Amino acid sequence: MAACFVCNKKAVYGKSVTFSAERNSRVFKPNLQSVKIRMPDGSTKRVMVCTKCLKAGKVVKAV
């Protein structure tokens, strides 16, 4: 599974519970976006970053 380049957030497993209390396995996936970022050495790299890190400004996009 893919993970966030910044915070290493990845898919977690849990249960979906119906009205009659039946439990089925399911996967909670992070909202990952493929973005081109500028690395500290000045180069660019395409990585997967979660939207929470994008909104917080934890990465600098390469334009």
Curated annotation (Swiss-Prot):
GO BP annotations, alphabetical order: translation
InterPro entries per the UniProt record, alphabetical: Bacterial_rp_bL28 (IPR050096), Ribosomal_bL28 (IPR026569), Ribosomal_bL28/bL31-like_sf (IPR034704), Ribosomal_bL28_bact-type (IPR001383), Ribosomal_bL28_sf (IPR037147)
SS bonds (residue pairs): none
Annotated GO MF terms: structural constituent of ribosome
GO terms for cellular component: ribonucleoprotein complex; ribosome
Cross-referenced Gene3D superfamilies: Ribosomal protein L28/L24
NCBIfam families: L28 (TIGR00009)
Similarity annotation: Belongs to the bacterial ribosomal protein bL28 family.
The protein, known as: Large ribosomal subunit protein bL28
Organism listed in the record: Hydrogenobaculum sp. (strain Y04AAS1)
Lineage start: Bacteria, Pseudomonadati, Aquificota, Aquificia, Aquificales
